[in-house]
């Protein structure tokens, strides 16, 4: 297959796009098999396509309850799709190549670099190995901790539940097997359980800060000054985007609840929208400001080169830094004594516009197609394009047009805005001559 890509000059972005599409198609076919459902009957193509897309794109939006509709085989297929989606299709392909003893070509290395947002091609195979070891280590630790809760309650079945939820949390997928306690109930029955809350939140955060950040933490530990600027920005934004939303949920949204439930609820609700999709609270009971804040968090997402989606914390940070520079009449935005490259600013602006366009158009189309109020439709749209999985309860009742919109949004959100554009639009080399410069008034 790599020879085919090389012969027809397929770009790295196009390889990523095609790779995700092929895995989704394969997952759809497997889920359509009668053995995949508890009833032993074939599930319709549309529902299987939606579920496979949601799993590969690590979103978590579902039209069929994962616990009650799908058999063990179907759940295993979904879990494998989540793992492939979280690791990245190209990363999985590279692992298979390395395990088989074959040499990784330059084209494969370039695709791997784009897939994990690595700064350079050199050492990418070693870095990929580091990523894979880290993923399975964290997922194993998460599963072992969750077994302490699920084994006493469910018996041997608790092992499967622990493994499933650990992988789903680390990959920021949001799929759950708690439907036996109530359809689409997610983790609401564990809203005050500290072990489940802390473990799931930790897995979400670790999976969402990015693989390069892991490398910095492993290499430099507490020596923060030696971290890459990107890692510093990611960790700073992660703290900010947990602390301030948690304060809002604690002091305003959940102020009527008992103290213990407020604490865990506020923390969990600040973490899960970026971009896991588990919930321990009834989101339909939230006020409009609470739903709006959750929508914004879903759009922001996690870090680049991570299991999280969204337009990324670094995108928001770059735009804020450049806005601060403009307010102070400085030429460049900066972080930690380093200037931000002009191309980075252009990319950040492009990503913001892409996500806003997809988010707003998706919400409007769903609202018009379903004759529903705009806010819950925008919430659904943000959840899909941010690959989150939170919903205000409208997903299972949506029609064909709306489901197709969500499928496209999930796919766009997982492959990444810039990757999607680079893969679908022809690129032109910069002309040797530069056009005349002229100022234009903005603001």
Language model: regions and residue ranges:
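Membrane-proximal intracellular helices of multi-pass ion channels
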Residues: 1-443
